[in-house]
Amino acid sequence: MVKWCDFTISPFHYFTISLTLYICLMIRKTHLITGGCGFVGRNMVKRLQATTDAQIIFIDDLSVGTHPDTWLKAAKTSEGEGFVIYDNRLLFIQADVLHVMLGFASDSDYFFSRYNLDVARINDVFHFAAIVGGRSKIDGDPMAVALDLAIDAHMFYWACRYLPDRMMYPSSSAAYPVDLQTVDGAIALKESDINFKKMGEPDMTYGWSKLTGEYLAKIAASHYGLKVTCIRPFSGYGEDQDLSYPVPAIAARAAKREDPFEVWGSGNQGRDFVHIDDVIDCILLAMDHIHDGTAINIGMGRLTSFNEIIQVFCKIAGYEPTIKPLLDKPVGVHSRYCDMSFVEQRLGWKAKISIEEGMRRVYEAAVAKSV
């Protein structure tokens, strides 16, 4: 017989109780999402809400992100100083993620100490918190973007000591050498085009910070045993993306039938546009198969110019405006798109949503918002 707590139970019952507890713990996981109110973060929150019964903790200081009251379809069940709980399993903490990570590093029971919330263990970590804001931010305030270095360093410092089950680190297509993305030298970028032993120059401080994050991920995996996946998403877009990004901004202007239609630069510069639903699909699949810090591309593998995007939206809107180039505006590299062969071979994954279908969804959302 086995003595457990104040009860004497048989080995069979002990096994049954232990198995039940184990199954409950395995089923009821807790996931952490930093930057959980930003574009990608909130889409991950909504996906996990819809497809799992896990407890979800998402952190955002709302400097750029949108409060979950405006986009989360869930009942508010509790709230306190600095946090809100929805449906008894989605916990939103309004805070600077740097402060939270510093608190975690010094106190393993930080959530209880700070918020009086009992969080036994964090299983998956989705680290989306970053200083972002599109091309104008990357070129216009590069030192602010460099703060991403501090955010990522503190996150990996905590993760290497806490060791969650899995972690996802979002790098960026901006980490690729800019000399591979010129007018004459543009190529479909392969994962192997980034080589830490033979470095090219990434895109501004944002690219450098993401490249450094990838390096930290490799160190975390090899030296500390952290199971980490890195992604290099290209130009993600979606219906609820902020208007500071080109796709929703172009859609909104097409919905208003702007004519002449202004475009930054010549409009011939191109990107690899991929819908947010496809991005989330690929992230979740990659986390099941990649744990050593290897970085993968997420894109369509197709170069589409901004002039072509304007044409798609205006065709949907049913008019043909005159295009007006704004040559004094920042445009970044000329051409950035990816080679998806590694992902197709390693994960068997391809994006499902075509440019035409994705842009139609964005346009319809823009029309709905303008009503």
Outline where the language-model segments fall.
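Intrinsically disordered, low-complexity proline-rich regions
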Residues: 4-18
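N-terminal Rossmann-like NAD(P)+-binding domain of SDR-like oxidoreductases, especially those catalyzing
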Residues: 16, 21-236, 365
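C-terminal substrate-binding subdomain of Rossmann-fold SDR/epimerase-dehydratase oxidoreductases
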Residues: 30, 44, 76-91, 95-96, ...
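A short beta-to-alpha transition loop/helix N-cap that caps and shapes the active-site region
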Residues: 65-67, 177-179, 239-241, 306, ...
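Structural element of the ATP-grasp superfamily
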Residues: 155, 217, 250, 343-344
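NAD(P)-dependent short-chain dehydrogenase/reductase
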Residues: 179-190, 211, 215-287, 301-303, ...
